[in-house]
Amino acid sequence: MSRISTLFGKLLQNRRKALIPFITAGDPEPGMMVPLMHELVQAGADVIELGVPFSDPMADGPTIQRSSERALKHRVSLQDVLAMVGEFRESDSSTPVVLMGYANPVEAMGYDAFTARSKACGVDGVLIVDYPPEESVKWVEYLKRQNIAPIFLLSPTTPQQRVERVASLAEGYVYYVSLKGVTGSLHLDLHDVAEKLDGLRSRISIPIGVGFGIRDGATARAVAELADAVVVGSRIIEEIERSPKAEVLTNVHRLVKSLRIAIDAASPAPSAAVKLTHL
């Protein structure tokens, strides 16, 4: 059983929801990444989404775009990101790590080399933003050969045919983008999220994480009432961006801990569609 499946199985048994923070590899600087990853875990993160820096992050808002730019100034490459995961694995063999990024760096390395290296370094899942599921069969085959979960995005405007395709390809969890637009958007409509998740659960048998627009504990708690996982990215990146270097770890820990506490205060009722048999 994969680390992701094991994690969600334990969470379901304990009637808890996952906290999935996103950070960009190399921001604020490469040498801080592994300590920052460990700090996230100590603060209560269940899964770490690690962004691969890219020069044209079309799905990301200004905050994460700036984060990617800072990492690229340090010349952080995909190889460097994988090395960071490998170093993290030297002292953490249980926390799932999911890479999130764009197709260009992966294709430059090649599917075979990328998936083999990812497996060797301890990557558990990969989400490529600009790979539509309809064109991802070959990509998914390479991932599954290495027991790496292919993770896909769904949104409020995803057509049913695409939902069905994602349901047939995805493993680990599905990332539901709760807002139209780019990362960092505001005005989360929880009623709409609840309705959309109800519809998705009749088709998606793996856990569903919700992200975009989650900026505080109250919203994180409300989303945890509806979803299997809460994904927080832009708010954490903002904390990194505005913190003096010496205070980054402390400030991020404080923020993530507050989100953890809020999520754990949510209703313990497990999400309707996720069963241990699906994990």
UniProtKB/Swiss-Prot annotation:
One GO MF term attached to the UniProt entry: tryptophan synthase activity
Residues forming the catalytic site: E49, D60
Enzyme Commission number(s): 4.2.1.20
Superkingdom: Bacteria
Annotated catalysed reactions: (1S,2R)-1-C-(indol-3-yl)glycerol 3-phosphate + L-serine = D-glyceraldehyde 3-phosphate + L-tryptophan + H2O
UniProt-listed Pfam families: Trp_syntA
Pathway involvement of the protein, from the record: Amino-acid biosynthesis; L-tryptophan biosynthesis; L-tryptophan from chorismate: step 5/5
Keywords, comma-separated and alphabetical: Amino-acid biosynthesis, Aromatic amino acid biosynthesis, Lyase, Tryptophan biosynthesis
GO CC terms, sorted: cytosol
PROSITE patterns in the record: TRP_SYNTHASE_ALPHA
Gene3D superfamilies: Aldolase class I
Assembly information from the UniProt record: Tetramer of two alpha and two beta chains.
UniProt similarity note: Belongs to the TrpA family.
Summary of the function given for this chain in its UniProt record: The alpha subunit is responsible for the aldol cleavage of indoleglycerol phosphate to indole and glyceraldehyde 3-phosphate.
HAMAP family according to UniProt: Trp_synth_alpha (MF_00131)
Protein name: Tryptophan synthase alpha chain
Source organism (scientific name): Nitrosospira multiformis (strain ATCC 25196 / NCIMB 11849 / C 71)
